[in-house]
Amino acid sequence: MSKTFVKSKEMGELVNTPSWMDKGLGSQNEVKEEESRPGTYGMLSSLTEEHDSIEEEEEEEEDGEKPKRRGPKKKKMTKARLERFRARRVKANARERTRMHGLNDALDNLRRVMPCYSKTQKLSKIETLRLARNYIWALSEVLETGQTPEGKGFVEMLCKGLSQPTSNLVAGCLQLGPQSVLLEKHEDKSPICDSAISVHNFNYQSPGLPSPPYGHMETHLLHLKPQVFKSLGESSFGSHLPDCSTPPYEGPLTPPLSISGNFSLKQDGSPDLEKSYSFMPHYPSSSLSSGHVHSTPFQAGTPRYDVPIDMSYDSYPHHGIGTQLNTVFTE
């Protein structure tokens, strides 16, 4: 019976778990505390070391020693280094200046050999190079095709890709304006048209009047009505004129002066002048015969009236001149 009692005591101790579990938990807590103690000691030791290092750096700064900087070290700027820098900069500036002077001289020489050299209007660098390229291309085309460098195609090749002022300068220097175009058209006309233009192209220069175009008779004829020219053409060539176009007139902007006072500055003339009369000039026959031989359209037997040249100009004709005109038209 005693043995069973002992067994019951042992079983009771085994069943009683909180006792031995408390012992195990207590041992684990002791181990953790032992492990955590050195960590706290290490943190404190590191803080004390940093504080000591900061104090040492402050002491070094107080002593005058600067801390070392990272990166490339800058050399001290001495007077010798400053002089070397200045001399190097002066040499670079002089080298760039001579280079630009040489480039400008070369461009000036290139402008002189271009077909549109002008002392007043200087082309820019890019325009000079473009014109030189077009000039070389146009000359090569002339050599290949054998055409003359005086046509319109040559100017078009020169002005390709250029600005409007440069194109105007090229056309002006080559003298290819509206007059040259008229000359090219004039070459294609028939000889009958040439003779017609030469007959009616009077060049009467009056002594006492200003320089052309006011002194020419062309300006007075051009302000006449188309019926007068029609009558002149029918009298010289018959009723049928050849198919030829006359060049457009580029006269002055100001109204022409009149010698005899037939053509006033007013646009609205008198009703008597609105009627169609045959044109009969009252200039002396000696002046016309000396200027041109062609005097067939004019009658030689008509009365002539000499008007003094040195009279003062008046926009409204006098009564005496009006009576002379009436007698001319009635006769």
Swiss-Prot record:
One of its GO terms (biological process) is axon development. This is Neurogenic differentiation factor 4. Gene3D superfamilies: Helix-loop-helix DNA-binding domain. InterPro entries: bHLH_dom (IPR011598), bHLH_transcription_factors (IPR050359), HLH_DNA-bd_sf (IPR036638), NeuroD_DUF (IPR022575), TF_bHLH_NeuroD (IPR016637). Residues 1-80, 246-265 are annotated as: Disordered. It comes from Homo sapiens (Human). PROSITE patterns: BHLH (PS50888). GO terms for cellular component: chromatin; nucleus. Probably acts as a transcriptional activator. Mediates neuronal differentiation. Required for the regulation of amacrine cell fate specification in the retina. Residues 87-139 form the bHLH domain. Residues 52-64 have a biased composition (Acidic residues). It is found in: Nucleus. Keywords: Activator, Developmental protein, Differentiation, DNA-binding, Neurogenesis, Nucleus, Phosphoprotein, Transcription, Transcription regulation. Residues 67-79 have a biased composition (Basic residues). Efficient DNA binding requires dimerization with another bHLH protein. Its main location: nucleus. GO terms for molecular function: DNA-binding transcription factor activity, RNA polymerase II-specific; E-box binding; protein dimerization activity. Serine or threonine phosphorylation within the basic region may regulate neurogenic activity.
